[in-house]
Amino acid sequence: MDEQRDTTDRFLPRFDAAGLVTAIVVDADTQALLMVAHMNADAIEATRATGQAHFWSRSRSALWRKGETSGNGLTLVEMRVDCDQDALLLRVKPAGPACHTGRRSCFYRRVEADGGLTFLADDAQG
C-alpha cells in the first residue's frame, strides 16, 4: 500500500509509531507559516467534521482544539496531504495569534550562524 500512497485518490494517512502525522499550519490569505503540530486520527476527524483545527498534544496526551482557551481558533480552509501521506498542510483563517506567546506565528526567531537568536520585527507580540 505504501507505494500507492503517492498515486491514489484516497486519503490514507501514514501515522508514525505514536499514531501521529505532522501538521504544518499556514495562513490561507498570506501563506505565512503559523505553527507545526501533530495530529492523530481523532484530530483529523474532528478537524474535518467541525472545520476548526484540532491537534494531539504530545505533552498532555490529549486532543485539543486550537483556541479552546485563548479564543484564537483556526478555521480550516483546506487540508492537503504530502506525497507519502505522512504530513499534512492546513491552510487556515486564524482568529488571532497562532502562538501561545501571543505572536502571529510560532516562528518568530531566526537562528543566526553563531547560534544566537534574533527576534523578527514582523512578528511582534500583539
UniProtKB/Swiss-Prot annotation:
Its EC number is 3.5.4.19. Keywords: Amino-acid biosynthesis, Cytoplasm, Histidine biosynthesis, Hydrolase, Magnesium, Metal-binding, Zinc. Binds 1 Mg(2+) ion per subunit. Binds 1 zinc ion per subunit. It is an enzyme of class 3 (hydrolase). It comes from Sphingopyxis alaskensis (strain DSM 13593 / LMG 18877 / RB2256). Homodimer. GO terms for cellular component: cytoplasm. Belongs to the PRA-CH family. Pathway: Amino-acid biosynthesis; L-histidine biosynthesis; L-histidine from 5-phospho-alpha-D-ribose 1-diphosphate: step 3/9. HAMAP family: HisI (MF_01021). Pfam families: PRA-CH. One of its GO terms (molecular function) is phosphoribosyl-AMP cyclohydrolase activity. SUPFAM superfamilies: HisI-like. InterPro entries: PRA-CH (IPR026660), PRib_AMP_CycHydrolase_dom (IPR002496), PRib_AMP_CycHydrolase_sf (IPR038019). It comes from the Bacteria. This is Phosphoribosyl-AMP cyclohydrolase. Zn(2+) binds at residues 83, 99, 106. Disulfide bonds: none annotated.
